């Protein structure tokens, strides 16, 4: 389908820079530049799609990386489509899997979907967001439609997927229905006539299937934009609830603030790039100040306040900061302390104390806990069987012994 060419103006270049910010890949960039130019010339906004399967009831900051990008493009005046994969969730996305993902029931999907959009609306502008469910067009397909859709893609192309190839070579079963998932996700783009589809880096294959199917159905092909997977608070693994290194967007303000303050200084700049709404120029200026001798803690506080304010309120962010500072002030916690990495998360507090060099023996660790002399992130430990999940913690024994403990799996 041909469209008139429009000039690539400085405004288009600026829009393109916003799209590229923090992204892993933008394919095909020259095509997307032409789409942006045409949109500016005609005043017709682009249709930008993000599909999420409601596989869990809560969203964490890792999910908001791609939502933030949607909001940036939404603020440029484009139409964003928040697609809830209520049909594809019954299949289960095989992306990155070493085994077949168990499908969800309709009841589980409906329960999870209720909170998904409400939480996503904390990032997206609800008044300018189109909500769709892919059961609208997938349910009516029926057996005939499904076979016709399957005829549009080859097994050889499907086996180009790294996870399918790995499982096939390793003798791990691949169910036929798993081939249908990327086809149906791609068909979503056909149904919605998407100009751009967003997703995580693990979704690249599925997004490319959407491009191919649009071509098969005589549509202009969508471009795809993939965003990196956010590293969790442990600084090692991608943010995940199962890894215990996540920050939920519905967490209490003080908890959210404290977790953000626990990340390393190096990881902080990655969080700025992927989570902050501040301009790149502002972030670069702040980084220059830190490099020039300003305390990195100031930048971390600003980041934590911005994110808490977004998901709660500016007042909640101020209160969380005050509570955090009071906890550190009352405990006289130093900003500089030894950093120790401890493996085997989740891990018991007694072993953590020994591994961090804060006590000489297990009995000393137990005695300090029983006497109320151990604190984690400023909170007194009262249970000697306390288990800590992966993450970074300030651990204190007595008044003078401190360590920043990075607990990894």
Curated annotation (Swiss-Prot):
The keyword Transcription regulation does not apply. A motif ('HIGH' region) lies at residues 54-63. One of its GO terms (biological process) is tyrosyl-tRNA aminoacylation. It catalyses: tRNA(Tyr) + L-tyrosine + ATP = L-tyrosyl-tRNA(Tyr) + AMP + diphosphate + H(+). Its EC number is 6.1.1.1. It is an enzyme of class 6 (ligase). A motif ('KMSKS' region) lies at residues 238-242. Gene3D superfamilies: HUPs (3.40.50.620), RNA-binding S4 domain (3.10.290.10), Tyrosyl-Transfer RNA Synthetase (1.10.240.10). Keywords: Aminoacyl-tRNA synthetase, ATP-binding, Cytoplasm, Ligase, Nucleotide-binding, Protein biosynthesis, RNA-binding. ATP binds at residue 241. It is found in: Cytoplasm. GO terms for molecular function: ATP binding; RNA binding; tyrosine-tRNA ligase activity. One of its GO terms (cellular component) is cytosol. Homodimer. Catalyzes the attachment of tyrosine to tRNA(Tyr) in a two-step reaction: tyrosine is first activated by ATP to form Tyr-AMP and then transferred to the acceptor end of tRNA(Tyr). Belongs to the class-I aminoacyl-tRNA synthetase family. TyrS type 2 subfamily. HAMAP family: Tyr_tRNA_synth_type2. This is Tyrosine--tRNA ligase. It comes from Bordetella parapertussis (strain 12822 / ATCC BAA-587 / NCTC 13253).
């Amino acid at each position: 389908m041909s469209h008139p060419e429009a000039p690539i103006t400085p405004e288009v270049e600026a829009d393109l820079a916003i799209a590229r910010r923090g992204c892993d890949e933008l394919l095909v960039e020259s095509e997307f530049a032409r789409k942006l130019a045409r949109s500016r010339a005609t005043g017709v906004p682009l249709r930008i799609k993000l599909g999420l399967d409601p596989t869990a009831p809560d969203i964490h900051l890792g999910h908001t990386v791609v939502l933030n990008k949607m909001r940036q493009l939404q603020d440029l005046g484009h139409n964003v489509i928040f697609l809830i994969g209520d049909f594809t969730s019954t299949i289960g996305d095989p992306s990155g899997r070493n085994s077949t993902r168990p499908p969800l029931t309709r009841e589980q999907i409906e329960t999870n979907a209720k909170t998904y959009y409400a939480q996503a609306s904390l990032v997206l502008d609800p008044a300018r967001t189109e909500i769709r469910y892919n059961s609208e067009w997938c349910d009516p397909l029926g057996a005939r439609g499904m076979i016709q859709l399957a005829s549009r893609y080859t097994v050889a192309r499907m086996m180009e997927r790294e996870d399918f190839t790995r499982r096939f070579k390793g003798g791990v079963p691949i169910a036929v229905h798993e081939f249908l998932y990327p086809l149906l996700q791609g068909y979503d783009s056909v149904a919605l006539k998407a100009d751009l589809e967003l997703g995580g880096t693990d979704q690249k294959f599925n997004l490319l299937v959407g491009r191919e199917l649009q071509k098969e159905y005589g549509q202009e092909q969508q471009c795809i934009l993939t965003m990196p997977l956010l590293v969790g608070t442990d600084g090692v693994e991608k943010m995940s609830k199962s890894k215990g290194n996540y920050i939920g967007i519905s967490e209490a303000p003080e908890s959210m603030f404290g977790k953000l303050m626990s990340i390393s200084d190096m990881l902080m700049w990655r969080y700025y790039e992927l989570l902050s709404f501040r301009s790149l120029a502002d972030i670069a200026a702040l980084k220059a100040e830190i490099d020039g001798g300003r305390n990195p803690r100031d930048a971390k506080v600003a980041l934590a306040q911005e994110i808490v304010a977004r998901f709660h309120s500016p007042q909640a962010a101020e209160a969380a900061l005050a509570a955090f500072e009071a906890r550190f002030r009352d405990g006289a916690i130093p900003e500089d302390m030894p950093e120790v990495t401890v493996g085997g998360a989740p891990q018991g507090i007694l072993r953590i104390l020994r591994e961090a060099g804060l006590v000489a023996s297990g009995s000393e660790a137990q005695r300090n806990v029983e006497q109320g002399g151990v604190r984690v992130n400023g909170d007194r430990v009262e249970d000697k069987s306390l288990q800590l999940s992966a993450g970074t913690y300030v651990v204190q024994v007595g008044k003078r012994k401190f360590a920043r403990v990075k607990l990894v799996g």
